[in-house]
Amino acid sequence: MSEHAAAPGPGPNGGGGGGAAPVRGPRGPNLNPNPLINVRDRLFHALFFKMAVTYSRLFPPAFRRLFEFFVLLKALFVLFVLAYIHIVFSRSPINCLEHVRDRWPREGVLRVEVRHNSSRAPVILQFCDGGLGGLELEPGGLELEEEELTVEMFTNSSIKFELDIEPKVFKPQSGADALNDSQDFPFPETPAKVWPQDEYIVEYSLEYGFLRLSQATRQRLSIPVMVVTLDPTRDQCFGDRFSRLLLDEFLGYDDILMSSVKGLAENEENKGFLRNVVSGEHYRFVSMWMARTSYLAAFVIMVIFTLSVSMLLRYSHHQIFVFIVDLLQMLEMNMAIAFPAAPLLTVILALVGMEAIMSEFFNDTTTAFYIILTVWLADQYDAICCHTNTSKRHWLRFFYLYHFAFYAYHYRFNGQYSSLALVTSWLFIQHSMIYFFHHYELPAILQQIRIQEMLLQTPPLGPGTPTALPDDLNNNSGSPATPDPSPPLALGPSSSPAPTGGASGPGSLGAGASVSGSDLGWVAETAAIISDASFLSGLSASLLERRPTAPSTPDSSRPDPGVPLEDAPAPAGS
């Protein structure tokens, strides 16, 4: 970000002399006193440059445009699916359970299942001595299908839902019944049944304890259980054929079941509790009022979460990089190093705590994890891939716009279809990354390669041959063109600042190479990175205390390892 901004010409140079000092000119003033940060930035920049060049050679422009269009088309399709599902199922009430609204047992459990082409009766009453309103009683032969979940399915993130709920345990009066307390709320240790992933079963009850009872205990205590079977091929509440296709192939029926049960819970004073039998997650229905002012709260929460996660991740990256540098020093110089246990442990605990806070907000650890992953990818893209002024100025705005759209949707509609909204937001963020890379970063890199090739094809330094190029670049026809060898220094990292003439050198170089004045810092910086190809091959040497391996010339008091050996004759001319 700010470390990539172009710096004024005479600032870091100290006014004139052309040695290795102007290496860091285009990256702006040295805001990072730690040299390891500069080394890390140059390393990532060189890796990004090599990957971009390889990408441009492997894939032609037509393929790149086609790939970019495909990503945009995919994002628009997912957005259309989200809008369609929201209009069809969220704006209109789900009436799949309207036929049992007045008949389901308030003192028992309502079990709702989704079965394709089921031959069972739509409504069955279990574990009741007599029928309820003429309902059919289920024979005992089907009892084996109603087994309890395994312990493994309850050891997931659903524990956080159970901590917010106080189970209502009623102590029996007699001592004989008190001995069977552990059987009233069983938690079987042996797996009873593993539900397939295509099963959709939820249970709803006004009493939380009824949801924790096994099927055998419910039958022994004669707790009525009404089983409602919904068939997507027959019931009209699942929408038209296209809606059923989306639900069956992409979204699933969990949200439909929860919305149907929520319609029943809205008419009850005690909103009750819901259990997803397949996943083992427990939910509690609460009354929430969401106004349009919730968008402001969503924006504030997004800014806090995004900045906190970005800061913690950058700090962890820095600590890991420092440890790698210390390890290389130990291997080369046989030095004893101290493992930075305290900083790494601090940042790990901070990230775990941040994920826990985000999980409480989103009511889902998976959503919180993917949001952290999205912020990390966006932060890496901004720090490594954004070098042109257009990308640095505008890409973050697109990222915050798409990211805020997810937060606003989640916060406004209470987390319904949040997973699909997060996928939509990420696809648009991904398209913005590809678009800015194809239209701004990659053309600047390819143009700088053409400039580098043009400069490499110039004749070697001589008394008469190089005079045409400096005269054209500097617009000076006088004799001072001979002692000014700075234009050939564009091959190395010292080509970034202007020579003695303030703004004439970079301005004329941009005019001769057709480069805009706003991107001159990026052009010079990329030229320095091209010359730093040897920096990757000798990584361990450049990460340590950088010492001149060749005898220093009288004019270069601080040689830089990024300067290639081909540039050695340049200071000699001064």
Swiss-Prot record:
Keyword annotations from UniProtKB, A to Z: Acetylation, Endoplasmic reticulum, Glycoprotein, Membrane, Transmembrane, Transmembrane helix
UniProt cross-references to InterPro entries, sorted A to Z: Membralin
Positions glycosylated per UniProt: N180
Lineage: superkingdom: Eukaryota
Places the protein is found: Endoplasmic reticulum membrane
Listed Pfam families: Membralin (PF09746)
Phenotypic effect of disruption: Lethality typically occurs several days after birth, associated with motor neuron deficiency and paresis.
Signal peptide as annotated in the record: none
UniProt-annotated stretches for the region Disordered: 1-27, 461-515, 546-574
Membrane topology: Multi-pass membrane protein
Biased composition (Low complexity): 461-470, 491-501
Principal location: endoplasmic reticulum
A single BP term in Gene Ontology: positive regulation of ERAD pathway
Entry-linked PANTHER family: MEMBRALIN, MEMBRALIN/KINETOCHORE PROTEIN NUF2
Record protein name field: Membralin
Taxonomic lineage: Eukaryota, Metazoa, Chordata, Craniata, Vertebrata
